[in-house]
Regions:
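Chalcogenol-based redox active-site neighborhoods
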Residues: 19, 47, 74
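Non-catalytic, surface beta->alpha helical segment in thiol-disulfide oxidoreductase systems
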Residues: 57-85
Length: 85
């Protein structure tokens, strides 16, 4: 599975979620992780992130299976990831 994170430096929720993103990487080391800056990375646009950041998109075989939008607590985030395992 692949997790794509789209965030921005001006987004407070993105900064808060950055710590949880690092924890995801530690707890799910077999996933592929990609990060894009909403303002700087043109590649982010292919995922159509919308206007609410951060966005974490979970892909399986290059198909989106889950989209997590906005700031989440650690338990909420891990629950959403666990649901697709």
């Amino acid at each position: 599975m692949k997790l794509v994170r789209i965030s921005s430096t001006w987004c407070v929720s993105c900064i808060v979620m950055g710590k949880l993103w690092r924890e995801l990487k530690e707890n799910y080391p077999d996933f592929e992780y990609v990060e894009y800056d909403y303002d700087l990375d043109e590649e982010a646009k292919i995922y159509e992130p919308g206007k609410i950041l951060p966005v974490i998109i979970i892909l399986k075989d290059d198909k989106e299976i889950k989209r997590i939008v906005g700031e989440k607590s650690k338990s909420e985030l891990f629950k959403e990831v666990d649901e697709v395992l």
